[in-house]
Regions:
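Short, surface-exposed recognition loops and adjoining beta-strand edges that mediate ligand/DNA contacts
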Residues: 28-33, 59-74, 153-162, 203-280, ...
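Membrane-proximal, proline-rich intrinsically disordered regions
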Residues: 17-65, 239, 307, 373, ...
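Sec-dependent bacterial lipoprotein signal peptides
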Residues: 1-16
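Inward-facing hydrophobic residues that define packing positions of alpha-helical scaffold repeats
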Residues: 106-109, 187, 194, 239, ...
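Conserved, well-structured interaction surfaces
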Residues: 78-151, 181, 198-202, 329-336, ...
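Extended ligand-binding clefts on enzyme/binding-domain cores
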Residues: 36-40, 46-47, 51, 185, ...
Length: 457
């Protein structure tokens, strides 16, 4: 019987996916799993739950397309238009995964949360169900953060109450239409879910397969969110919450420099596996040899920096990116790892002028990234130069993880003045700081279905 219940649930999900997650449909009575193992099986399906958008990778400055001909040959209009920050990213393309995939995660999470909460009332809540409840809350928070940062304006503490966010869905049914909430309301839901998840998640160490949410993953996500919000004291607080429990780094001297898949997706540094959707131009090891790593970024790596040979393939002076912390997966890694959290911590230390501690923490990271015996300790002399050094290390370490776009947005809100530029033939395309081009369009088929407000771009 349990298998039939699960099958019915999955069929209902697939039906909902094909019609769009915010579309009003006539009948949404859904049979849902009733046992802990069924819930866990759904949450473990990484192709359905936890997938994040890849538009931030397509729009960021970590790569270039060398010729206009190659750009025109991109597989989709979305790839072409994201590259030049066109007003209409999707060019008429429908069923955009950057919008649909996070809402699919929300849909799964809402159904699991609802069913587990029914069992709260009976008092028959096993430790496994408590952990599953925490995992579902985590996934809903992660999905909403992905949506609100991609489809709303860059976060601003002063305007968050009037800035338009994304539709919030907490009810498991799918037969009603939601309008867009404020950015503040979206972030409130995210924090409520994560704080509640921390009381239910069972594990505060990484699990062997690195595929399930833990307290560590919640700490990492909270640190990432607060960094994006430029609330550096809280970003550091949650970075510490993780690093005080788990802080393993990989010694890159022990990693193959010649393998195209130098890492496994269960490596010691990993907190939780996570992948994005995929386009050909965002895929790792781009088989068409048309997408190359930004040359300015490549020049940042010193000769003894092992990341140059471990992260990239040198194709006659042009570099392509290897597969990363997703192991053999082709999509960009957007999960959680110790290196990101440590860099969050270091940046926060610099911002509160704890330069000595910041330089020691940076040394710990870079001793594991340079050839043995070649790294020279960098003593930070002043806050400005220290911050510049740390932000450059973020670029070098966290490449191809869909984090650079979010960093540009938050840094430009602080006046960094980063201007993005692309050249195709005789045409030069630019994206100025704090302009509407940093907000992605909502797919037009979603606008047509639900009538929600489109973004100005």
């Amino acid at each position: 019987m349990k298998k039939y219940i699960l099958l019915a649930f999955l069929l209902a999900v697939l039906t909902a996916c094909s019609k769009g997650f915010l579309e009003e449909i006539p009948n949404s009575n859904i049979l849902t799993p009733e046992q802990a193992e069924d819930f866990q099986r759904l949450l473990d399906n990484s192709e359905q739950v936890g997938v994040t958008g890849v538009l931030p990778q397509l729009a960021a400055d970590e790569y270039y397309i060398s010729t206009e001909k190659d750009w025109l040959a991109s597989a989709t209009a979305t790839e072409r238009n994201s590259y030049i920050w066109a007003k209409d990213i999707f060019g008429g393309e429908l069923e955009i995964n950057d919008w649909n995939a996070p809402y699919k995660s929300v849909f799964y999470a809402n159904n699991i949360i609802s069913e587990v909460e029914k069992q709260f009332k009976t008092g028959d809540l096993t430790s496994a169900l408590r952990d599953i409840y925490g995992q579902a809350l985590f996934h809903r928070a992660k999905a909403y953060f992905d949506l609100v940062k991609n489809f709303s304006v860059p976060f601003d503490a002063l305007t968050q109450y009037t800035d338009i966010g994304v539709p919030i869905r907490k009810d498991p049914s799918i037969d009603y239409t939601s309008q867009r909430s404020s950015v503040s309301d979206c972030h409130d839901l995210i924090f409520d879910d994560l704080n509640k998840a921390l009381t239910y998640l069972a594990y505060d160490t990484p699990l062997p397969e690195r595929n399930r949410a833990t307290k560590l993953a919640a700490f990492a996500l909270l640190s990432r969110i607060y960094l994006y919000r430029r609330e550096y004291d809280k970003a550091e607080q949650y970075a510490d919450s993780l690093l005080n429990r788990y802080d393993k780094l990989i010694d890159y001297n022990k990693v193959s420099q010649t393998s195209n898949t130098p890492f496994t997706k269960t490596n010691d540094e990993l907190i939780m596996y996570g992948a994005t959707g995929v386009y050909r131009n965002s895929g790792q090891i781009n088989s068409s040899q048309t997408v190359f790593v930004d040359s300015t970024l490549i020049k940042m790596y010193a000769p003894n920096d092992l990341r140059l040979s471990i992260y990239f393939i040198n194709n006659g002076g042009k570099y392509t990116v290897k597969r990363g912390y997703n192991g053999t997966g082709l999509t960009p890694f957007n999960g959680f790892a110790v290196d990101e959290v440590l860099l969050n911590k270091i940046e926060c230390l610099v911002r509160r002028d704890e330069l000595s501690q910041a330089s020691l923490s940076m040394e710990r990271l870079l001793l594991n990234r340079y050839k043995t015996g070649t790294y020279n300790h960098v003593a930070f002399a002043d806050q400005q130069s220290a911050l510049q050094f740390v932000l450059q290390e973020r670029r070098k370490e966290l490449v191809w993880r869909c984090l650079r776009w979010d960093d540009i947005k938050r840094l430009n809100k602080e006046g960094k003045g980063i201007v993005l530029s692309r050249r195709l033939g005789d045409a030069v395309y630019k994206l100025e700081p704090n302009t509407p081009g940093y907000v992605f369009n909502i797919p037009q088929d979603e606008i047509n279905r639900s009538g929600i407000i489109q973004n100005i771009r």
